């Protein structure tokens, strides 16, 4: 008979680090050029006027101004624009 209890090891117990995705500047908010507006996976939001789209689909402001979210087109796409202030 075993004099020690057999102790199994769990193969679970790990998780990936949160990626901090989401909207960083909301509608009507003043932002400066170069600031991040949305961090996302894929294009849930599309880049509108005065905004750029990074290679990881991050939308950023190209000019200083106010953030504007709008739904356009037949497919109901969400666009993020900057209205220069």
Curated annotation (Swiss-Prot):
Cross-referenced SUPFAM superfamilies: Ribosomal L27 protein-like (SSF110324)
InterPro entries: Ribosomal_bL27 (IPR001684), Ribosomal_bL27_CS (IPR018261)
Family matches, as HAMAP family: Ribosomal_bL27
Keyword Lipid biosynthesis among UniProt keywords: no
Annotated signal peptide: none
Record gene name: rpmA
GO terms for MF: structural constituent of ribosome
Keyword Calcium: no
Family as reported in the entry's similarity comment: Belongs to the bacterial ribosomal protein bL27 family.
Organism: Cellvibrio japonicus (strain Ueda107)
Full protein name: Large ribosomal subunit protein bL27
GO biological process: translation
GO (cellular component) term, any one: cytosolic large ribosomal subunit
Pfam families cross-referenced by the UniProt entry: Ribosomal_L27
